[in-house]
């Protein structure tokens, strides 16, 4: 599927997430932009006129910044942060459940 809300175990490396996100963005953009090639060409024209305004972004361990160039209307950062936000929520609910289970065990043990 395009949007795996639970990233498979051991697949938290940025390269995997980025590839996944590119796939998702491409899919979203196809729904939104009737002619993606034309859209990209226009974006490149804008960059050519003002190259200093363009930041290519970077991606190294623990740090991801998508830069200004994106194809279509969805900024890559949005999907990436959504993935991480979801992972954090998932972890939070697991932690909560763990605490509840520990409390139940304590009560049962009394």
Swiss-Prot record:
It comes from the Eukaryota. GO terms for molecular function: structural constituent of cuticle. Keywords: Cuticle. This is Cuticle protein 13. It comes from Limulus polyphemus (Atlantic horseshoe crab).
